Regions:
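Short, exposed beta-strand "edge-strand" segments with a Pro/Gly-rich flavor and a Y/T-containing core
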Residues: 40-46, 117-123, 259-268
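Alpha-helix N-cap/loop-to-helix initiation residues
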Residues: 76, 103, 170-171, 258, ...
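Intrinsically disordered, low-complexity Ser/Thr/Pro-rich tracts
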Residues: 133, 147, 158, 229, ...
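Conserved alpha-helical substructure of the radical SAM core
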Residues: 1-116, 127, 131-135, 139, ...
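Accessory C-terminal segments flanking Radical SAM cores
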Residues: 2-20, 187-310
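Conserved C-terminal portion of the radical SAM core fold
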Residues: 20, 61-69, 88-95, 112-123, ...
Length: 310
């Protein structure tokens, strides 16, 4: 089953808020701007009380799905279960994502408050895995995957778990090893086309150049970009993306760019920030926004004109 054929719950939802509860990641992946350290890796953790206020405001505005990640690794937050529990207890659909290359103390305590979990890998053996996932250990990933399997089998957690295998020209031959490894598991194994090419990025870095191809035809520093990687409708216009400082950013795809902050989520008006998003010249170059506007019902278009679209 391909990534795009796997129409899971998270992608079918439109009322999503994405919150980076930590501004950092332990991995140095060659196809990720965070991993490449194109932007700072501060490891700043969002204060729990700030997070609760953000969740409350988002809930009041109708958001019922929350992803505790954008460009950060949520499992590095020591009290992650408290963040999950707060949103879960409000009745929100809680999503997590991780490289899983770490020791996790209370996996059950975290995942009992989660509804969906992504685990991202790029190999089955350490030799292949470490090409893209620099600084990560595949044995730790498998250890955590085995724990989840046991918890699922014992009925101690009920979380839709998806292992996403980022496929490149050098590693697709190991995808079937994960399929075999999890053939009797409740965990879904999905092949997802990888962004860019880690070997090209490594070459560019060696030449002192910035590898930008990982993101389709992105032009950095506020220039227009064309997303040719994803070819399906994505509700980025409706999605709220919040960084670890509590600021709302234009788009989750470039949430790391401070120049694209459109307001403070708690202090500023939601409708005014959404208006900025809809009027953004940057977004005019993104086909996902155009497709989104094209499929809106007339009533929703009227709401946009009234600045009441969230």
């Amino acid at each position: 089953m391909s990534y795009r054929e796997n129409n899971h719950k998270f992608e079918s939802k439109q009322n999503t808020i994405e919150v980076d509860i930590i501004d950092g990641c332990n991995a140095k992946c060659l196809c990720c701007p965070r991993g490449l350290r194109i932007f700072p890796n501060t490891m700043k953790v969002m204060d729990l009380e700030l997070y609760k206020k953000i969740v409350d405001k988002a809930y009041d505005y109708g958001k019922r799905v929350i992803a505790l990640f954008s460009w950060g690794e949520p499992f590095l937050v020591q009290n992650l279960s408290e963040y999950c529990k707060y949103a879960h207890d409000k009745g929100m659909y809680v999503c997590l994502s991780s490289n899983f290359s770490m020791k996790i103390k209370d996996l059950e305590g975290i995942l009992k408050y989660a509804n969906h979990l992504y685990v991202s890998v790029s190999g089955f053996t350490q030799e292949v895995y470490q090409i893209t996932h620099r600084g990560c250990k595949i044995d730790l990933v498998k250890e955590n995957i085995d724990k989840i399997n046991q918890l699922l089998n014992d009925g101690k957690i009920d979380v839709d778990t998806e292992l996403r295998y980022f496929g490149y020209d050098y590693n697709e031959f190991e995808f079937h090893l994960w399929e075999e490894y999890l053939k009797d598991s409740k965990i879904k194994v999905v092949l997802q086309p990888g962004n860019s090419n880690p070997r090209i990025n490594l070459y560019l870095l060696s030449k002192g150049q910035k590898p930008t191809q990982w993101f389709g035809k992105v032009c950095w520093y506020g220039d227009p970009y064309y997303d040719e990687v994803q070819n399906v409708y994505c509700s980025m216009v409706r999605k709220f993306t919040i960084n670890a400082n509590g600021d709302m950013v234009l788009c989750c795809e470039k949430a790391f760019d401070d120049n694209l902050v459109i307001g403070n989520f708690l202090e500023d008006d939601i409708y005014e920030m959404q208006e900025k998003k809809l009027k953004s010249k940057q977004c005019d170059y993104c086909f996902m926004k155009r497709e989104f506007i094209n499929i809106l019902k007339k009533s929703e278009k009227d709401l946009i004109k009234q600045h009441k679209f969230i």
